[in-house]
């Protein structure tokens, strides 16, 4: 006899969601793909992938994300970065969405957020689109069939792309809405089919919940040395900076590519899958990720393909620069079976410098690491957010401001404590431009970045000779095997040294202006490490 695939005492009607058409609980991948094809949501691709376009929204909509303002969360939410929504407006939104859902079929996935059983979040994701069920099943952690019979969700996400919000009635910015209600343990998503909103909603929940447990939630990828989970490394970075690419290293075991927690036990992945950008993806540069684009169950999102042969075009960005594939971790041959690692020995902060000023790698003191973590300097890459069409320099605190419900200092102090306790080495790595700014310079060669990271992770880089950067105060290696010396000194890569100096001074000023907001909230050693 097969196990029931849902808790019989926790169906949607038990949560007050009634009047729907057929409700499909915890379908497996073949059934979800079959349903999505029958419903005309997309096409079956080569190898059993699912090809889909998300329509108008091909990236996240951070300006349409709201947190419901209640006394319970009033003092703990970073309101300067999170748009408030009044409880009464949320209730109207909730009621109107439930009314809109009546008579329609829905797909329910009961999943875990977090590989550490003691810290995981039990999440129910209710989706209008069958392929969204496949996506979130790929991305989160899948319970065993025997666990589903007793599954009780702590939070529920309802995603209804066909629902358009009414800004006047629902207290939101536009017809697109992502509304988080921590009191009601409910997230409502409307008028966007971009699947990334589902996974980032779970990330936002964990970013709120875990700090109270002394756990540092991080927008980072992570891996560890082969056969040694205690030699782990984390890679902070905004979307498009190289988290997925650089952590998928054949010589190391992948823990995860995007979202992790750092507890007293070490590192744990929040997810059970990866959501990789596919623009200009190649079998030569990234063989593991490329191979997933032809494996059963992978969701291929917003990629152009030949209608006759179904061959994917990895260079055609006519739909978006933010084309992606979503696949379960087990599709990566060197992925960890547990998604766990020990205390990190190396903390790497990835920045995509569109000004072409920062070196390819720099060694940071713990105070400098705290400074750069709070600064979060990088560039938004095209397509990752609505309206971003070219690399746009930005300061995204904690390398993930759109997903941080609490104030930055909360996460910064947690990181400071973790680094102090473990003695992890800290590095800043520029995967952006060299030899000039975006438009004149070129992207940092990935071979050089990989060589520098290998040297940092195996410890050999600590034996190199370092120079102190005159503009930013951190230490930069003078020579590293396998990397052109000139590349390590960004001023030498520019044809006009004076132009480099001017650009560097400009960036120093930007760092200084941005960091003023944290000046009264940090320790003296971090203040002393400030740039400018």
Curated annotation (Swiss-Prot):
The keyword Nucleotide-binding applies. Its main location: cytoplasm. InterPro entries: PEP_carboxykinase_ATP, PEP_carboxykinase_C, PEP_carboxykinase_N, PEPCK_ATP_CS. Binds 1 Mn(2+) ion per subunit. ATP binds at residues 200, 219, 237-245, 286, 324, 449. It catalyses: oxaloacetate + ATP = phosphoenolpyruvate + ADP + CO2. One of its GO terms (biological process) is gluconeogenesis. Its cofactor is Mn(2+). Mn(2+) binds at residues 200, 219, 258. Signal peptide: none annotated. Its EC number is 4.1.1.49. Substrate binds at residues 60, 194, 200, 324. One of its GO terms (molecular function) is ATP binding. Keywords: ATP-binding, Cytoplasm, Decarboxylase, Gluconeogenesis, Lyase, Manganese, Metal-binding, Nucleotide-binding. It comes from the Bacteria. Belongs to the phosphoenolpyruvate carboxykinase (ATP) family. Involved in the gluconeogenesis. Catalyzes the conversion of oxaloacetate (OAA) to phosphoenolpyruvate (PEP) through direct phosphoryl transfer between the nucleoside triphosphate and OAA. This is Phosphoenolpyruvate carboxykinase (ATP). It comes from Paracoccus denitrificans (strain Pd 1222). The lineage of its organism: Bacteria, Pseudomonadati, Pseudomonadota, Alphaproteobacteria, Rhodobacterales.
């Amino acid at each position: 006899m097969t196990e029931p695939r849902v808790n019989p005492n926790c169906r949607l009607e038990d949560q007050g969601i009634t009047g729907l058409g057929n409700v499909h609980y915890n379908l497996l991948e073949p059934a979800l793909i079959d349903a999505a094809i029958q419903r005309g949501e997309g096409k079956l691709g080569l190898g059993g992938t699912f090809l889909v376009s998300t329509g108008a929204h091909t990236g996240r909509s951070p300006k349409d994300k709201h947190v419901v303002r209640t006394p319970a969360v009033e003092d703990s939410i970073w309101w300067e970065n999170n748009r408030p929504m009044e409880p009464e407006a949320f209730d109207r939104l909730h009621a109107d969405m439930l009314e809109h859902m009546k008579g329609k079929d829905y797909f329910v996935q009961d999943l875990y957020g977090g590989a550490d059983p003691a810290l995981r979040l039990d999440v129910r994701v209710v989706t209008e689109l069958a392929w969204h069920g496949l996506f979130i099943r790929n991305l989160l952690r899948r319970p065993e069939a025997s666990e589903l019979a007793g599954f009780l969700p702590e939070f529920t996400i309802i995603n209804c792309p066909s629902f358009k919000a009414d800004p006047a009635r629902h207290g939101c910015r536009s017809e697109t809405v992502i509304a988080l209600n921590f009191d009601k343990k409910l997230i409502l998503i409307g008028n966007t089919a971009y699947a990334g909103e589902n996974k980032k909603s779970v990330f936002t929940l964990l970013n709120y919940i875990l700090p109270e447990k002394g756990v540092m939630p991080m927008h980072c990828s992570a891996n560890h040395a082969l056969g040694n989970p205690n030699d782990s490394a984390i890679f902070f970075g905004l979307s498009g900076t190289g988290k997925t690419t650089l952590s998928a290293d054949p010589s190391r075991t992948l823990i995860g590519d995007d979202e992790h927690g750092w507890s007293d036990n070490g590192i744990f992945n929040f997810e059970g899958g990866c959501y990789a950008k596919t623009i200009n993806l190649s079998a030569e540069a990234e063989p593991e990720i490329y191979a997933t684009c032809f494996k059963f169950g992978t969701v291929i999102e917003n990629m152009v393909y030949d209608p006759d042969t179904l061959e994917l075009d990895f260079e055609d960005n006519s739909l978006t620069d933010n084309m992606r594939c979503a696949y379960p971790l087990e599709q990566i041959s060197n992925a960890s079976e547990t998604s766990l690692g020990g205390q990190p020995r190396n903390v790497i902060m990835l920045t995509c410098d569109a000004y072409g000023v920062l070196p390819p790698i720099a060694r940071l003191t713990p105070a400098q690491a705290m400074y750069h973590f709070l600064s979060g300097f990088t560039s938004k890459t095209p397509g990752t957010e609505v309206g971003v069409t070219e690399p746009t320099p930005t300061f995204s605190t904690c390398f993930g401001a759109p997903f941080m419900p609490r104030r930055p200092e909360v996460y910064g102090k947690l990181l400071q404590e973790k680094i102090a306790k473990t003695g992890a080495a800290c590095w800043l790595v520029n995967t952006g431009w060299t030899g000039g700014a975006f438009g004149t310079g070129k992207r940092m060669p990935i071979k050089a970045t990989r060589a520098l990271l290998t040297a940092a992770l195996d410890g050999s880089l600590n034996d190199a000779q370092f120079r102190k950067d005159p503009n930013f105060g951190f230490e930069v290696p003078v020579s590293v095997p396998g990397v052109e010396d000139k590349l390590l000194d960004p001023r030498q890569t520019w044809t006009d040294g004076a132009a480099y100096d001017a650009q560097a001074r400009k960036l120093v000023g930007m760092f200084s202006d941005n960091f003023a907001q944290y000046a009264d909230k940090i320790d003296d050693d971090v203040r002393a490490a400030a740039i400018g």
